Curated annotation (Swiss-Prot):
PANTHER family: ATP-DEPENDENT CLP PROTEASE ADAPTER PROTEIN CLPS, ATP-DEPENDENT CLP PROTEASE ADAPTER PROTEIN CLPS1, CHLOROPLASTIC. SUPFAM superfamilies: ClpS-like (SSF54736). This is ATP-dependent Clp protease adapter protein ClpS. Involved in the modulation of the specificity of the ClpAP-mediated ATP-dependent protein degradation. The lineage of its organism: Bacteria, Pseudomonadati, Pseudomonadota, Betaproteobacteria, Burkholderiales. Residues 1-20 are annotated as: Disordered. HAMAP family: ClpS. It comes from the Bacteria. It holds the Pfam family ClpS. Signal peptide: none annotated. It comes from Albidiferax ferrireducens (strain ATCC BAA-621 / DSM 15236 / T118) (Rhodoferax ferrireducens). Belongs to the ClpS family. GO terms for biological process: protein catabolic process; proteolysis. The gene is clpS.
Amino acid sequence: MATKSPVNPKVPLVQEPDRDEGGAVVLERRTQKTKPPHMYQVVMLNDDYTPMEFVVVVIQEFFGKDLEAATRIMLKIHLDGKGVCGVYSKDVAATKVDQVLDAANKAGHPLKCISEPVGF
């Protein structure tokens, strides 16, 4: 008994290629839709030992805030127990957290800083 080889149906191209006068094939490019990256907020947590002035300086230095904005964030941290210093992509937020923790550690302060996803 002879077996038939399966017939492979032709898979159509996205769009029929156009040929220019030189015989080259030109395919149309599909645009890709990419989602924006997930964002993370960098949050400083209050403690009873880190001086307020140090927190203000750290916010100015690592988050680019002016004195007034840094003071507002520091007061939010002090009064509410935590405050958002900025919103960044995951890698940038992790770097900011590391910078804050390193500066606090070098200065001998127990300041804590975390990053958490926004909108989850």
